Amino acid sequence: MKHQGVAMVISAIFALLTAFPAIASAGKILRYTDHEPYGNMRTQFIKNVFFSEIEKESQGRLKIGAHWKGDISSSYNALSTLGQGTRADIGIIVPEYTAEQLLLHQIFKSFPLGPANGEAQVRFFHRVFQQYPQFARELGQNNLVNLQFFLGYPVGFFTRQPDVKLKQLEGTKWRTASFWHQSFLRNAGGATLVMPWNDKITDALRTGQLNGLMVNLDSGDDIHAQRAAPYIHYSPALWLGHVYLLVINKDTLNALDERDRLAIRRAAETTEKQLGAALDSGLASLTTRLENEGAKLHLLSRDEQLEWQKATRYQEVQEEWVRQQESKGNTDAGKLMHELRLLLEANARQKR
């Protein structure tokens, strides 16, 4: 009986030890939502770099259950979905799609020109989010905390005809989504048409209903706009100001162990160091492919960029927007607009 008891104890200990790796490996799964399908520059970078670093830094305690292509939430519902935290813990939000809730985040896109390469763009956003707590506060009001920002491609002007002068768009019809960019095009002489985002925009370009499309390069490529409007003006400095925020539900973050919160922070730091180079490499690959497929790309000179900026009368547009916000009691809008303008102007002077 004594030997039998010892054997039972040994068996129990062995079972516990063999089960321990499985228990440890289970970890905490954070449900991730993204409105875009997996496979483009941003989604691959997030999965292969940020998510991998989170698992590595947490020693496997944290794992990501990724859902792409709006499987959990569309881009327009992501803010509320993540704020509630019942269906997803972390995910991408695009401030432009929730302008009322993320009012101050709209400021970025109001600048026609910005940093001229990926590294400079990353430095700019890092500084802004570190220096101005108003942005974190705005997210906090929606029960969210930003883990890491990601950026997209610059603006491309897809046109049916060659040699379009961006400073003189009289008699031309354009499609663009941003209310800022609509004002810019109208100030440069163009007319803007409202159309839902789908392949019918390419058809409208082909038939002449539209003369041009102003959109980030990869989105234009998604609907094959270059097949109907093969002449593309672009520059890395034609700054879309389109920031993707990878956020976490505040309650979810607070429920994590301190060591796991620190692991996520280290993963974000590593990711950010690689982001600028990834942006530049992705842009180079995309433009090369577009050219190989027959598109005629024109890299705008600095003088052409400044001509476009002047034609937009962007400061007038900004001032009108600030007046509207201040009339609603949003007193931070004007101050932040001024501060970001100074930062971008200082960046431009450094590049001269």
Set out the residue ranges of the language-model regions.
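Bacterial N-terminal signal peptides
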Residues: V9-P21
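N-terminal secretory/targeting leader peptides
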Residues: S25-V122, F135, L139-G140, L144-R352
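Hydrophobic, aromatic-enriched, well-ordered structural segments
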Residues: Q4, A22-I23
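Intrinsically disordered, low-complexity, polar/charged regulatory segments
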Residues: F129-Q130
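Positively charged n-region of N-terminal signal peptides that target proteins for export
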Residues: M1-G5, V9
